[in-house]
């Protein structure tokens, strides 16, 4: 999990842990399970990368019928978002095949977002964009459905522009 500070990486990790039965779904987003150090819990930020292995079952469906179930193991690394701990992100990225890029829908692409996207690009990681904190569009910004849709499109365009810049620089 990579992204800017306070975009919800640790809370998202909690949700994945809850889906695996490691913590209760009610505690997800509050317990910050991956922030196991006392100073991380006190400050409310991740300072060291933490890893956990999760298992997921995926049903194979062929022509509407379940053909079987595949088991997958996902090694999840929750990384810090603060610039002071960017070496933790670099180290974690070198251990991974892919990355979930967590972006707060209201904050959008921030400086550390660009940095972690660049790190993922340089390390050849397959990235998946996770748009987080969707409730803020309604509770804080009070957007209509059409305005929220437009905001999401803008965010995706921002991310694509950043990655497109990396591609253009690599081609020169």
Regions found by a protein language model. Give the residues of each.
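P-loop NTPase switch module centered on the Walker A-proximal segment
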Residues: 1-102, 141-144, 150, 154-163
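Short helix-terminating capping/connector loops at secondary-structure junctions
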Residues: 68-69, 170-172
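Conserved C-terminal guanine-recognition region of P-loop GTPase G domains, centered on the G4
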Residues: 93, 98-171
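Detector for methionine-enriched segments
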Residues: 30-34, 47, 122, 134, ...
